[in-house]
Amino acid sequence: MRKIKIGLALGSGAARGWSHIGVINALKKVGIEIDIVAGCSIGSLVGAAYACDRLSALEDWVTSFSYWDVLRLMDLSWQRGGLLRGERVFNQYREIMPETEIENCSRRFAAVATNLSTGRELWFTEGDLHLAIRASCSIPGLMAPVAHNGYWLVDGAVVNPIPISLTRALGADIVIAVDLQHDAHLMQQDLLSFNVSEENSENGDSLPWHARLKERLGSITTRRAVTAPTATEIMTTSIQVLENRLKRNRMAGDPPDILIQPVCPQISTLDFHRAHAAIAAGQLAVERKMDELLPLVRTNI
């Protein structure tokens, strides 16, 4: 009797992606062996480490991050393409991950990216592993796109935030999907909602027009108890809204067999220094799904 293959589809989610580490560790702990891994964006970075038996090294690296470590890894770009070049963080990632071809991974692995010219998803099932990861992680506007075979490639989440279809195409009989964006609306409400006291509102509205203009430009100190979202927050939150709609549509037509959803609304897009909290959320999410996961262990598939 042929052994049933279990596939893991790791979704996008930026800093929440460290939850994938907790999910994988928890699955291993209960005896569920993953045969196939497909990743999108941060899911490709974590998935590749697992596929190459380097997950422990990745966990050691990311759990050592401080807030200032993350800032130092952000190499601002003054050129076109994105706010960050992305070279600094991926150069350090190369110290953990071997330079290898995708087909040489210990487990079947693939990453998804988006072709900006065609608008279609591109599946990396062979070739340069680091190229695939770098392309899949290129959040539009935030990180510079990757040139490949005459095309510009960006984050796979633009077209396929949770690569369930790719996991099945690689031969998975059962797909466990990890969704990191299901509770993003909680963070969006916190980010985009605010209260202005009546007193402050009246004071602000009573300012002459030229003073209000200077206030908006930041030339004088605002009298309102309001902190407007930054340009990066607006961009990333908008992308999350679009990704969530796309994700729901795709999963309606191609649902996973088991869906794991770590809860970590307190971790925002660039909170990569909060790996401990994200990993714990991933482990807890697996524990909550044990009723669905235990049959995979009991049947020894």
UniProtKB/Swiss-Prot annotation:
Pfam families: Patatin
Domain of life: Bacteria
GO biological process: lipid catabolic process; phosphatidylcholine metabolic process
Active-site feature positions: 41, 155
Domain PNPLA span(s) in chain numbering: 8-168
Short motif DGA/G, span: 155-157
Key word DNA repair present: no
InterPro entries reported in the protein's UniProt record: Acyl_Trfase/lysoPLipase (IPR016035), LysoPLipase_patatin_CS (IPR001423), NTE (IPR050301), PNPLA_dom (IPR002641)
Keyword Phosphoprotein appears in the UniProt entry: no
This protein's UniProt keywords: Hydrolase, Lipid degradation, Lipid metabolism
GO molecular function: lysophospholipase activity
NCBIfam families the UniProt entry points to: PRK10279.1
Protein name per its UniProtKB record: NTE family protein RssA
Organism of origin: Escherichia coli (strain K12)
Chain's gene name: rssA
